């Protein structure tokens, strides 16, 4: 035991103080979040992380979660402080509050639901204050209050009362320790507490944390600012030079060789396995407060720090580090160089130098510190260049050689930008120096550099110079173009031509010249160009198409053939793929906006040490580690919100863990939403802390979007006025190395409006069928009614038509009658005329006959008169006039004469004439004239007719004839 004590004394007391005071050369990036950002109280007491990468903070206002983009808070039912946290293998979140403890787990709609365990505590132990420690051990979860430790196993809680007062509880490896005021340090074994150290160094000693330090060695820190080493049940106080006498409430292991402790005086200390502080991170290094209440190391080796004024994250595990030579007065890093096992850094105010550890792959992990090189301040130090085994410094004051601790002036010309060797043979005997006001020669002879004088005619500022295989010097000017310079053998005479846009450059502005793969390359606003001597013009390079469209300001090739570059916005590397003979462009989002825009610098020392000029010092990238430790990113669906007059959270970020341990949406959780919920906002994230704000997302709403969206750094998507149907929102994330995550999906259904639902459609079908039935029924009735109306109408029409016909017929009859009447009238007139003609002729003939009878003469004359008289009688008896008369008479009297002849065949021609005359109401006298008989003869003839015709005694002959 004495031997061990001596050994520990030697280790912790004899170690050189200067070494202990040094830090790792490279600082990790520190980001801070105040309570306005995370939406909680100013004090955080504990930090944990689940299997998906989501962080949990026990805060003075409850439980706070952070998924890389979004902060959320959950209060306890009694709205008290959460002092302690623990997350088990099933991602159940156990919390210890004030007067209560329990757990959070996913509930409906993806939110966290709190379940109190207080009801399981025996009644007599339910009165307790704060739960200061919560952790799992074996199959149990332990909760430490001041007076009692509760052990949850299954659905039962066992009680471990304090003998006096429980000061501490913590797990170290496979052991659970607790400190009791009376019984000292105890270990939990076989369901009871066994003593480890019954007697502590002093009575009021209170343990704050216990950390494993190598095999079977535990560092014990107390609230009384004391630090001890526990080994083999022996507690030894550590040297104050190793451990600060400060309040150390929290500690966490980083890896097998380092751990972090939270310190009340200086913030965080990173310590190695021997207990030595290798890095201090306090307010100067970026923390907002040095009073640390909790520290936690996440899955990516980031250190999360809870302090009085907020939450900080230290990107300790990152391959990117920051070399800041002067934390009190920040300087811009302009150039860097490794020379003689020292890192030289030229800045906006002099040169800083730091020793680096030999044999250490990652030089930023050297235990060292920067110091200002003597007399190098007072202006910008633009250039560090090794030439012929000498270290040259291009300074605002001129060109110098750094030798030992002195600056040897080589040129007093103001402002040296660069030094270009004019041959590749070692040692270089001559170089060209670009200055603020032209070009100058630098000669090397007998191990000494001397100025060769200025080249006359060059008065411009030349920051970039390169030499090609034809010994042509190319110099770029920021706003004029590119100079092509050929020196004569004496190096003083030269031929210089200014080449501009007219010679193929995309612009006269922002052109820079570099040498890549032994070829002169011109970086422009539109990509990379080369010079074609056959065309005497600049042409876009076919070898570097990946750079097309980029505004390149700086290029540097590394030993692996990768091309590091700076644009006007970021720094990246074109990683060469030897298999495909192509480049993959990789950006570094961690340092976006930090490089020295306009005065860029990249030093590709090797794959473990890439130095980049920054606004604050130099950025160091261990590129090999950066690539090797890159992990496939994880995407999280943080929230789904239905947008309406009052937004509704449909999903709050937590899927259910299935049997395979994968988080996914269960079928029972797939919502069917009313049609009014047709506008949504999806929020997503990735817990890739350090670059989480630069991750790119792609999404698709299956059922609406035809394709995946383009990659962009936007962590939310909204949809409005979606139609009813089934949808699946899916999202994935891509990091800067083009690694793509698995897809996370969320299924939901928008139901049709009630008037388009299945039941509504069934009702519509029934109503439609009923409507059709009623329609046809009504139509049938209407048709019948219309048919009746039609028939009635048709009857009316037929009646009207009949009337029309009858009317027409009557009209026709009338017209015919009128026509007949006209014809009768005409014929009557003709008949009357004929009758009058007959009467007149008859009378005339009678007069002629009478006159002839009066004539007396000779016998011969008497014979002639007799003959004439006979002729007259023949005329009177001529039937020609009668035939015409009979024809007209029958037409006017409906065939009167024909009827008489047919009905009374015994009637003679004269009988018919007499009947016709009687029908015409001729008088007896008129008839006698027409018949050329006497009146008496007419009367006799009438008498005979009465006999021939069956005329009654009481009926006149005229009436009888009129009835025929």
Question: Where is each model-derived feature located?
Answer:
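Residue-level "micro-hotspots" composed of small/polar
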Residues: 21-49, 76-81, 103-132, 164, ...
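Residue-level detector of Asp-centered blade-edge/turn motifs that repeat once per structural unit
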Residues: 49-52, 87-90, 136-138, 171-173, ...
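Conserved beta-propeller blade signature
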Residues: 54-57, 92-94, 140-143, 175-178, ...
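Loop/turn residues immediately N-terminal
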Residues: 60-64, 99-102, 146-150, 181-185, ...
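Short loop/turn segments that connect beta-strands within beta-propeller blades
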Residues: 67-70, 106-109, 152-156, 188-192, ...
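Cytosolic signal-transmission helices at domain junctions
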Residues: 321-325, 760, 773-846
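Helix-turn-helix DNA-binding segment
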Residues: 876-877, 883-940, 959-963
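Basic, Lys/Arg-enriched C-terminal extension of HTH/homeodomain DNA-binding domains
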Residues: 943, 947-964
């Amino acid at each position: 035991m004495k031997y061990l004590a001596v050994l520990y004394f030697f280790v912790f007391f004899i170690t050189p103080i200067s070494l202990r005071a040094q830090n790792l050369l490279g600082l990790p990036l520190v980001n801070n979040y105040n309570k306005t950002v995370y939406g909680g109280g100013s004090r955080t007491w504990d930090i944990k992380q689940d299997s998906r990468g989501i962080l949990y903070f026990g805060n003075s206002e409850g439980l706070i979660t952070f998924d890389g983009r979004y902060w959320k808070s959950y209060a306890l039912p009694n709205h008290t402080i959460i002092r302690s946290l623990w997350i088990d293998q099933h991602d159940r979140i156990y919390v210890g509050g004030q007067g209560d403890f329990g757990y959070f787990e996913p509930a409906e709609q993806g939110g966290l639901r709190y379940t109190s365990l207080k009801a399981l505590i025996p009644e007599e132990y339910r009165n307790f204050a704060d739960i200061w420690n919560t952790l799992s051990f074996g199959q149990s979860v332990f909760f430490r209050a001041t007076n009692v430790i509760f052990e949850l196993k299954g659905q039962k809680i066992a009680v471990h009362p304090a003998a006096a007062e429980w000061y501490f509880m913590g797990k170290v490896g496979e052991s659970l320790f607790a400190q009791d005021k009376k019984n000292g340090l105890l270990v939990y074994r076989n369901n009871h507490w066994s003593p480890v150290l019954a007697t502590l160094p002093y009575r009021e000693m209170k343990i704050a944390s216990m950390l494993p330090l190598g095999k079977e060695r535990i560092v014990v820190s107390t609230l009384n600012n004391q630090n001890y080493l526990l080994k083999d049940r022996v507690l030894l106080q550590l040297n104050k030079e190793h451990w600060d006498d400060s309040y150390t409430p929290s500690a966490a292991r980083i890896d097998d060789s380092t751990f972090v402790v939270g310190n009340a005086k200086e913030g965080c200390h990173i310590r190695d396995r021997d207990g030595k502080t290798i890095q201090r991170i306090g307010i100067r290094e970026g923390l907002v407060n040095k009073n640390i209440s909790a520290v936690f190391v996440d899955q990516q080796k980031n250190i999360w720090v809870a302090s009085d004024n907020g939450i900080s994250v230290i990107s300790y595990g990152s391959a990117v580090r920051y070399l800041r030579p002067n934390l009190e007065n920040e300087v811009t890093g302009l150039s860097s160089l490794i020379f003689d096992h020292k890192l030289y850094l030229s800045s906006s105010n002099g040169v800083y130098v730091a020793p680096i550890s030999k044999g250490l792959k990652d030089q930023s992990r050297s235990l060292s510190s920067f110091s200002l090189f003597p007399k190098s301040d007072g202006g910008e130090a633009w250039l560090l260049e090794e030439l012929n085994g000498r270290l040259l410094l291009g300074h605002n004051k001129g060109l110098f050689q750094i030798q030992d601790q002195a600056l040897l002036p080589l040129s007093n010309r103001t402002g040296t930008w660069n030094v270009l060797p004019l041959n590749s043979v070692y040692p270089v005997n001559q170089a060209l120096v670009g200055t603020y006001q032209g070009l100058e020669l630098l000669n090397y002879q007998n191990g000494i550099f001397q100025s060769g004088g200025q080249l006359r005619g060059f008065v411009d500022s030349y920051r970039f110079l390169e030499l090609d295989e034809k010994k042509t010097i190319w110099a770029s000017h920021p706003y004029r173009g590119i100079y092509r310079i050929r020196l004569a053998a004496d190096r003083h005479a030269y031929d210089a031509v200014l080449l501009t846009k007219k010679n193929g450059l995309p612009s006269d502005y922002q052109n820079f010249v570099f040498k890549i793969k032994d070829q002169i390359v011109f970086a422009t606003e539109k990509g990379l160009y080369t010079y074609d001597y056959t065309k005497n013009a600049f042409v876009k390079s076919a070898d570097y198409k990946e750079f097309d469209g980029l505004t390149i300001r700086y290029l540097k090739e590394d030993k692996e053939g990768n091309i590091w570059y700076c644009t006007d916005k970021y720094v990246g590397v074109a990683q060469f793929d030897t298999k495909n003979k192509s480049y993959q462009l990789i950006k570094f989002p961690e340092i976006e906006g930090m490089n020295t825009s306009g005065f860029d610098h990249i030093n590709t020392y090797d794959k473990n040490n890439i130095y980049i000029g920054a606004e604050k010092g130099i950025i160091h990238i261990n590129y090999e580690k950066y690539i090797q430790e890159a992990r496939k990113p994880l995407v999280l669906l943080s929230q789904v919100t239905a947008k309406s007059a009052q937004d509704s959270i449909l999903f709050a970020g937590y899927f259910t863990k299935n049997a395979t341990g994968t988080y996914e949406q269960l079928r029972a959780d797939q919502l069917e939403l009313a049609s009014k919920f047709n506008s949504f906002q999806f929020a997503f994230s990735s817990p890739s802390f350090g670059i989480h704000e630069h991750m790119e997302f792609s999404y698709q709403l299956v059922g609406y979007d035809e394709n995946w969206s383009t990659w962009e750094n936007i962590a939310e998507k909204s949809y409005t006025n979606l139609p009813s149907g089934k949808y699946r929102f899916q999202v994935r994330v891509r990091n800067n190395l083009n690694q793509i995550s698995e897809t996370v999906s969320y299924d939901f259904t928008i139901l049709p409006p009630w008037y388009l639902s299945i039941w509504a459609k069934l009702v519509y079908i029934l109503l439609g069928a009923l409507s059709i039935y009623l329609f046809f029924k009504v139509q049938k009735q209407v048709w019948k009614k219309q048919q009746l109306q039609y028939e009635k109408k048709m009857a009316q029409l037929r009646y009207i038509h009949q009337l029309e016909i009858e009317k027409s017929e009557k009209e026709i009859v009338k017209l015919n009658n009128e026509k007949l009447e006209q014809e009768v009238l005409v014929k009557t007139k003709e008949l009357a005329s004929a009758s009058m003609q007959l009467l007149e002729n008859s009378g005339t003939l009678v007069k002629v006959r009478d006159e002839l009878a009066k004539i007396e003469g000779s016998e011969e004359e008497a014979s002639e008169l007799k003959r004439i008289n006979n002729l007259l009688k023949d005329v009177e008896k001529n039937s020609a006039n009668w035939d015409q008369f009979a024809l007209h008479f029958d037409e006017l009297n409906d065939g009167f004469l024909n009827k008489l002849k047919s009905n009374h065949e015994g009637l003679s021609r004269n009988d018919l004439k007499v009947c016709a005359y009687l029908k015409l109401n001729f008088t007896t006298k008129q008839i006698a004239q027409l018949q050329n008989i006497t009146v008496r003869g007419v009367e006799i003839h009438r008498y005979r007719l009465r006999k021939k015709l069956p005329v009654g005694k009481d009926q006149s002959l005229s009436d009888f004839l009129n009835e025929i």
